[in-house]
Design a protein with these regions (language model features):
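Extracytoplasmic "Venus flytrap"
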Residues: 32-54, 78-85, 107, 176-181, ...
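Beta-alpha junction/loop-to-helix N-cap segments that form part of ligand/metal-binding clefts
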Residues: 46-53, 65-136, 144, 205-214, ...
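Extracellular/periplasmic periplasmic-binding protein-like sensory domains
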Residues: 247-327, 341-343, 393-418
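Solvent-exposed, acidic/polar segments of extracytosolic/periplasmic ligand-binding ectodomains
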Residues: 354-418
Length: 418
């Protein structure tokens, strides 16, 4: 009897062990859910749709090469529709209902600031792929776009140089929200440090979706009569289309009043006749026109993805800086997960520090413990075909300074996530 009972107990234990083992194996083979949080409608769709598309391309590339830790990635795409409170609602859903391991998303700083408390409360992980104003460092966000010292400051230094036209007066034009206002606060302080007076600086803001730039462009022409002038544009979204069209209509040439943009790239210019805009500038960390083997491969994969998925725009679709930053972010996250052996947010965070990736820009980008990438800086001139000629770039990558030295009170703030 004792022997029979012992055998029965052993069989039950073995079955239980097998059940647990099978459950663990099944769980290990379940796909890893990945959130994609971009506006696919509304004023920001012109810029953000391509970030969703390139994220899906990158996820597909990873899945075809075996996935991450032997598991496929499953994208969960949501559309916050350029509605800032809706971003927070969608982010909460991704974390609590869909149980995503990571989110790639947001463009505007107002959308990022809308979701930030959600990711910090629930200990989620967000990769943010767009240039921004700095003044932020969260353990729950990795910033793969540029900080002001990797875009705004070098661009204005270039405009002031002999090579860049020797500008003495600056018209700061932006969309009315935190990124343009904070960036221009930094730029005004920087210009003061270079001896530029307030009388030689003009600041103008328009709402999201603004479409009538006739009066503003007329005021730019009038302001430019006071001396060599440059326009610094932090306009975001589909308002860039009427602004650049009005520049062309008004005959405002780059040789007279150059415009440097921080949120306009190949995608935003795709639907515009750029011949009247030749010579105007954009500052980024990547341009589609650069040539190197990594970028050639990136563009080839993108063209194939567009064709195989019959994406709107077809062979006219382009690559741009935030797309590259999205691609780099996803690939770095994959490397960090594999290093950590887990998708656990705290483990992945630690594994992200020091991650390197050979980017389409031609540079090896490094993730620092301040959660920002070291990146190159490039300035490009608009061409007649909507692409950019790179006219200036840094020889090496530049470490991001999230806390600008031109903002009072930033002295002594830690340059790492605590």
């Amino acid at each position: 009897m004792k022997r029979r009972a012992l055998l029965k107990l052993s069989a039950v234990a073995a079955a239980a062990l097998l059940s647990v083992s099978n459950f663990a194996f099944a769980q290990a083979r379940e796909p890893i859910k990945v959130g994609i949080l971009h506006s696919l409608s509304g004023t920001m769709a012109i810029s953000e749709t391509s970030l969703k598309d390139v994220a899906l391309m990158t996820i597909d590339e990873i899945n075809k090469s075996g996935g991450v830790l032997g598991r496929k990635l499953e994208p969960v795409v949501v559309d916050p529709a350029s509605n800032w409170p809706l971003f927070a609602e969608k982010a909460r859903g991704l974390l609590t209902q869909d149980k995503v391991a990571v989110t790639f998303g947001c463009w505007t700083s107002v959308s990022r600031k809308s979701v930030l408390p959600v990711y910090e409360e629930l200990n989620g992980l967000l990769f943010y792929p767009v240039q921004y104003e700095g003044e932020e460092m969260s353990k729950n966000v990795f910033y793969t776009g540029a900080a002001p010292n990797q875009q705004a400051i070098p661009a204005v230094e270039y405009l002031m140089s002999k090579e860049g036209g020797g500008a003495k007066r600056f018209f700061l034009l932006g969309t009315d929200y935190v990124y343009p206002r904070t960036t221009n606060k930094i730029l005004r302080a920087f210009l003061h440090s270079k001896g530029v007076k307030d009388s030689d600086i003009e600041e103008v803001y328009t709402p999201f979706g603004h479409a009538d730039y006739q009066t503003i462009v007329a005021n730019i022409k009038k302001f430019a009569q006071g001396g060599k002038t440059a326009v610094v544009s932090t306009i975001n979204g589909d308002s860039n289309v009427p602004f650049y069209k009005e520049l062309g209509n008004a005959g405002l040439k780059a040789k007279d009043v150059p415009v440097v943009a921080f949120s306009v790239g190949e995608e935003e210019l795709r639907g515009i006749d750029t011949k009247p805009l030749v010579g105007h500038l954009a500052a980024w960390n990547y341009f589609m026109s650069i040539k190197n083997p990594v970028d050639d491969d990136f563009k080839k994969k993108w063209a194939a993805w567009v064709k195989s998925n019959n994406l709107p725009g077809g062979d006219k679709r382009v690559t741009n800086d935030p797309m590259e930053a999205t691609y780099v972010g996803i690939m770095m996250w994959k490397q960090a997960v594999e290093k950590a052996g887990s998708t656990d947010v705290d483990k992945v965070r630690k594994a992200m520090y020091g991650q390197q990736f050979k980017a389409p820009s031609g540079f090896t980008l490094v993730m620092n413990n301040n959660h920002h990438l070291s990146k190159p800086v490039m300035i490009g001139e608009v061409r007649g075909d909507g692409q950019f000629n790179v006219v200036w770039k840094t020889p090496t990558v530049i470490r991001a300074k999230p806390w600008s030295p031109y903002i009072p009170g930033n002295e002594g703030k830690p340059d790492q996530v605590m």
